Every structure is written in structure tokens, then in C-alpha cells.
Amino acid sequence: MGKVYVFDHPLIQHKLTYIRDKNTGTKEFRELVDEVATLMAFEITRDLPLEEVEIETPVSKARAKVIAGKKLGVIPILRAGIGMVDGILKLIPAAKVGHIGLYRDPQTLKPVEYYVKLPSDVEERDFIIVDPMLATGGSAVAAIDALKKRGAKSIKFMCLIAAPEGVKAVETAHPDVDIYIAALDERLNDHGYIVPGLGDAGDRLFGTK
């Protein structure tokens, strides 16, 4: 059964405050998202398995621990998810990066895939899907669907800010997926924005609308 993890680390919460602030400019916003993604990656990789190897220090031989050959994949949901990728790769530079692009069908209002590019060894990798916002949950559910449809068996979802509605949607559709968030906000407004939220993450990351 999937779990929901809310990271209340002081550094994450401090930086998240400035990410939320409407007066934070594009450059600083981008840097802060990158930094928070790195801090969250530190926590999300806490359960990686370790194995012992023998090394030689300048003083003697020793047994030491290394990550046990886990293959990781980072999957940003386009476009805003791109802003979190480099922060994660700072800690796990060997991870492969895929991309999932979705748009909302104007008739059904449901997410539709327009681009999916994944590592060739999908079934062998542990995936982290990243998107700054988990609002209605539609994009997150669709992205997880896309990965599972192509053979992925181990998936985590990571975002900066989530609404209860989005968390519930992911839990209902994919109860096996753990959700990692920096803040769980109050609700969605009538326009589908998270309250208090941070606005449109993609617009603020890239300076475009």
C-alpha cells in the first residue's frame, strides 16, 4: 500500500516559502525549485539498498557500503517537471531521464499523452515521477498509467505542493505508489489552482505563459 510522506525539514520549508512568494523572480524561483528537489531527493532515496564492498584506505583495508546496483529513472511531467530534474541528478547522476508530455482534452477535460520517451529497460528501473504541483491529480495518474502500461513496476511520485484532492486521486487510482511532497495545502479553488499554492509553476519557472 502506498504512503504519503510530507517533508517538514526546516531547509525545505524555508525555501518553499520563497518559492510561494509572488515577488520571487524567475531566476531565483528556478534556483529554489532546483535546491528543494535536491533536498527531497536526499529523503526519497533513503530506502535504497546497500551492499558491502572491500576497499583500501590510506591506512588499511576496510569493508564499506555502496548502493546495491539499483537502476533509477527520473521522469518529469512536461513542462514544469523539468525544473526539478537537475536537482535530483546532483545526487543520483547515473539515473536515466525520460519525459512524459500531457495535455488536457478540451471536450473531456482528461489528460491525453502527446509525448512519451522512456529508458529502454523500463521493467528493471525504479522510477521517480516529478511535477512541482499535484492539483487535481489527473496528470499524475495519467503519467503513472503511462509508465505502468510500458512495464514499470516500481514508481514513486514527488512534488513540491499538493492539494488533498490530488493526493486522493493518486491514492485511489494507484494505491501502490508512494507520494512525496514538501507541503500539503488546503484545497483547490474553482479554477483548479492549489490554495495557497504558488501559482502556475511552469510559467514561473520559464518566464512564459
Curated annotation (Swiss-Prot):
One of its GO terms (molecular function) is uracil phosphoribosyltransferase activity. InterPro entries: PRibTrfase_dom, PRTase-like, Upp_B, UPRTase/APRTase, Ura_phspho_trans. Its EC number is 2.4.2.9. Pathway: Pyrimidine metabolism; UMP biosynthesis via salvage pathway; UMP from uracil: step 1/1. This is Uracil phosphoribosyltransferase. Allosterically activated by GTP. It comes from Geobacillus kaustophilus (strain HTA426). 5-phospho-alpha-D-ribose 1-diphosphate binds at R79, R104, D131, P132, M133, L134, A135, T136, G137, G138, S139, D200. Catalyzes the conversion of uracil and 5-phospho-alpha-D-ribose 1-diphosphate (PRPP) to UMP and diphosphate. Its cofactor is Mg(2+). Uracil binds at I194, G199, D200, A201. The gene is upp. Keywords: Allosteric enzyme, Glycosyltransferase, GTP-binding, Magnesium, Nucleotide-binding, Transferase. It catalyses: UMP + diphosphate = 5-phospho-alpha-D-ribose 1-diphosphate + uracil. It is an enzyme of class 2 (transferase). NCBIfam families: PRK00129.1 (NF001097), upp (TIGR01091). CDD domains: PRTases_typeI (cd06223). One of its GO terms (biological process) is UMP salvage.
